[in-house]
Structures are given as C-alpha cells and as structure tokens.
Amino acid sequence: MTYITATYQLGTTDQLPKRAEQIALGLTVGSWTDLNHLEQQQLESFKGQVVHTEEHDGKGYITIRYPEHNVSRDFSAILTTVFGKLSLDGQIKLTDLQLPASFTTDFPGAKFGIEGVRQLIQVHDRPLLMSIFKGVIGRDLTFLREQLEAQLAGGIDLVKDDEILYDNPLTPALDRARIGRDVLNAHYEKTGKRALYAITLSGSVFGLKDQTKRLIEAGATAFLLNTFTYGLDVLRELAADPDISVPIFNHPALSGALIASPEYGIAAPVLLGTLPRLAGADLTLFPSPYGNVALAKDLARGIAVEATRIGETKTILPVPSAGIHPGLVAQLVHDFGTDSVINAGGGVHGHPQGAAAGVLAFRQALDAALAGESLTSAATRQEELRVALDAWGITK
C-alpha cells in the first residue's frame, strides 16, 4: 500500500500523541474505538496512520500518512484530505507534503522544467534574467512594444506581464501575443538570441484552455498564471495538455494569505515549491528575502530546494522576486545558485539611463559575480553597472 504523507506543526505539545491520532482518524475513517472488530478489519486499509510525533521549542510536530486510495487524483481531493477542515482547527500549519511515486502518471509535472526552458533560449551556464512590464496599465500597445524592445535590447532572457495586466481593450492579450512574436523574432534576427515573453492568463476558468491555444497560435511563447486565484488543478490541466506547448510561470498572488503566519496555513516551501512543481509550473515566483515584502531567507531557500528537488517530476526554476536590483546579484547567486532566475521590475525600469541600461547592468553584475569579481571592481569599467550601484548600492 502507498501513502500520502503530511507533516504538521501544532501550537501546543499538550497530549500530542492523542491529538495526532485524532487527526489521522478524523481525516480518514472518522472513529476507531467505537467500531467492532469486523468493522475495524474492513476499514484498516483506509485508516490514517501516525508515523511520528515530537516536541520542539514548545511546539508539536506530527507526521501522518493517508492511504492513497482514499483520494481521487487531483489537488482538490489531496489538500482537502490532508488540510481541509483541519486548517480551521486552531494553531496548525502544514509543513511538508509528499506524494507517492504512483501519482506521477496523474501529476507528470512540468513540460519543460529547468533544462527545457534553458534549451528554448540556449542559455545553460548561468542564472536566467527576467524583467517585468511596469506601468503598462492604462497604456496602449505602442507603449508595450517599446518597453519590450528596450528590455530585449539590454539582453534579457525572459519578460513577463505584470500579474494584474489582464485581457483588456487597450492591450488585448491576442495583440500582446502578436507584438511579442514580432519583437522576439526581430530580436533573434538581429542578435541570434532567443527570449520568451510570458502573457498573463485571465478570464473564465472554463475558457482558459481555448484562450491559451489561441494565444499560442498568435505567437505566445510563455504564460503567467495566477495559480492560487485559479487553483492548482487549473495549472495541472494546462500543463498536461499536449497542445499547450510553451512554459508556464507560477505567480504567488494570494499565497500570502496562506504562508504569512508562522502558526497557521501552509509552509512557503510546500505552497510555492512542492505544489507548483507537481502541478506543472516551469518557473515558480516567490518573495525574495531582500525586498519590502521579504520572505525569511530559510523559507525562500526552502522554496528553491523544493522547486529543484530531483524526483519523479522535472525540476523547475525558482524565481526570487521583489526588491531585486543589480547590487543584489552576487547575493542572489550565492543564495540561490545558477539554476535560478533573477527577476526585476523597478531594478530594470528605474535605472537612470533607461530599461535597456537596467538590463545591461544586471548582465554586467551577473558576469562579475560568476567570475568571482566584486561588483565594485566591475563597475569601474562598466558605466551601466556603476550608475545602478550609485542608485541602489550593494547588498551583502
């Protein structure tokens, strides 16, 4: 028999073994001691089992395994079983979730993953660089085209829409796809370098598949999905569709409601690392440890560990985001390694010399960091980096 295994943090150590047994039974067969011997024999294979309990710093930690045949093969069933009504039951946090290998046929994970995305843009030996459209709400397609051209001119690898740039009359998604196709192709013809542009998916959940396919026909090369406002099973269905043949970026919008509390909700590495990887994201965005919405470094690095965990599904690219500027690049490489994405909005568009110079400053900082050269030293001969460091400084 195979199991789904979940670990929880409780706000108390009071009667921990008893509490663990109550949870294991309450989320499976409901009761046990009230059953007669025959009923217990019949239900034994459906019963949750306590694997481990321990106490640490005044908190209780319990691990429970649930028979995999208790659930249907979807995230709704899995999460409702392991943390549905339990999430309402006082100070309790889901800190780890492991699915059995038998689930891989229904949870195949990312189409591309780290190596697939790298292959698309032919960049294999460094972190990827991504920038974000900024200030495009209320602007027209000409403005969007100019921003895309400027970001590409600096040598960016990936560009994504803002997560709040939905399909709209001023910049319709189909037109953005066509512009992206034309600008990316022109960039390739000029430089020989490929890049991807991720368009935000929006609209009715029942129309998303058709929308993505129309966008691909129009030239879309990647998508940004607000996964937690749509649901993990929506991501899974999109990623599993063979006709949706471009990478999908997972955005963490709404996830703060689940990860922010140290006592409640779902641990950030599970919600933004494990689950998007299993659901089929190729990249997963999350708050960096450095910005104004900073996530604790151990949690941010934990997300990256889960995103790049080697197992039955492809590894995916971790994307620490928010508050990123060129002076952070060496720290980012140190904290997240080369299989990661350096993602900036204001750090690109806020460069005093413009967005193209902003991207170039990131490239210069990255080259220096990978060569083991200090950013201060590199800035003495590279103006774009010098101007960026004057504006933002160096974070260590």
UniProtKB/Swiss-Prot annotation:
On this chain, the residues bearing N6-carboxylysine are K160
What cystine pairs are annotated? none
List the cofactors: Mg(2+)
Q: Which InterPro entries match?
A: Diketo-Methiopentyl-P_enolase, RuBisCO, RuBisCO_lsu_C, RuBisCO_lsu_C_sf, RuBisCO_lsu_fd_N, RuBisCO_lsu_N_sf
Q: What is its EC number?
A: 5.3.2.5
| Gene Ontology terms describing biological process | carbon fixation; L-methionine salvage from methylthioadenosine
**Keywords, alphabetical:** Amino-acid biosynthesis, Isomerase, Magnesium, Metal-binding, Methionine biosynthesis
By sequence similarity, the record places it as follows: Belongs to the RuBisCO large chain family. Type IV subfamily.
Function in brief: Catalyzes the enolization of 2,3-diketo-5-methylthiopentyl-1-phosphate (DK-MTP-1-P) into 2-hydroxy-3-keto-5-methylthiopentenyl-1-phosphate (HK-MTPenyl-1-P).
Subunit-structure text: Homodimer.
Anything further noted? Has no RuBP-carboxylation activity.
Recorded protein name is 2,3-diketo-5-methylthiopentyl-1-phosphate enolase
Q: Which organism is it from?
A: Exiguobacterium sibiricum (strain DSM 17290 / CCUG 55495 / CIP 109462 / JCM 13490 / 255-15)
UniProt gene name: mtnW
